[in-house]
Amino acid sequence: MDSAGFEGSREDSPMPKLTRRDAGLILVAAGLLAPYSVAADGKPLAIKGYDPVAYFNMGTPTRGLPEFELEWDEHRYHFVSAEHRELFKADPVRYAPQFGDYCAMALAMGERDEANPENWLISDGKLYIFGKPAPMGPALFQQDLAANVAKANQNRPLIQAR
């Protein structure tokens, strides 16, 4: 037995050694993934942590930061700055994706598909996010925007109930 009360030595162990460097990398990786999951209170992170205001103000999908978090409509939103958080807080309906984390085109077709925050469209001042590969989702959705929005709104409660 060794001084810790275990038989055998580290050299005999079939498990590879975990170095301090490896442990540090594991902790860093865990920290990077943690903000993009469900919180301890059970509220999911909206649009995978992307800042909804950034689509409008920066013209690009941009990941928000946990330190600029706001809860709205049973979801947690992350923002790139306190300014973006305050803009959203003042008018969340303006900035939130129209169909939350669902692909807008899939809902219009009566299907359920998770949205990809990198595949998006702003039309008539509203943010739509798609799961289908660009440009299929946005291009197809925009061909008959009014009808697709109406179908998606009609199908959403049915899809959510599944």
Regions found by a protein language model. Name each.
Residues D2-P14:
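Short, Lys/Arg-enriched N-terminal segments with co-localized hydrophobic residues
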Residues E11-S13, L32, D41:
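Compositionally biased, intrinsically disordered/low-complexity regions enriched for serine, proline
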Residues S13-A30:
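N-terminal secretory signal peptides and thylakoid transit peptides that target proteins
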Residues A29-S37:
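Hydrophobic h-region of N-terminal signal peptides that target proteins for export
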Residues Y36-R162:
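Charged, low-complexity intrinsically disordered segments
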